[in-house]
Amino acid sequence: MQKVVLLGSTGSVGKSSLEVIEQNKEKYEIACLVALSNDELIKTQAKRHKKAKIYIEKPRNKLSSKKLINKNDLLKLISSNNVDTVIAAISGSDGLELIHHSITSGKKVLIANKEPLVMAGEFLVNEAKKYGAQIIPIDSEHCSVHQSIQGKKENSISKITLTCSGG
């Protein structure tokens, strides 16, 4: 059973990821749901994932729940043996710190947006090699590139051109 931390569980990619996980309950279990501010939706999600912890960066309302954890606890959880995979479905650069922490903790990290790879791709890839982590892109464009270069030697590719982007 893969234990998953879902960064950005209340966004569109996060909600889609939850649907896939819920359809594959025998393979995956949510260890923690992470959101920026949508505390109402994350509470609903947590009811469906009874064992999941909750972390909200900027809650809109005061929440009280035994499941609620602080950022330090989130970092400890990601570092622990209780997590196998981190899905980074946070837009922009906001998830970069948690992505880096997940990589340095040796996790499998599924990245759903291009920004972290554009900003720090070489650094993150080198860190993944150093710490034995996996970076797997799940956004359409960079997932296609990832799939296209699997099994190829690094020096055999000099250029990649994307002919369209954004749908």
Regions picked out by a protein language model, each given a short descriptive name:
Residues 87-89, 111, 162:
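Redox-cofactor binding/interface segments in oxidoreductases and associated redox assembly factors
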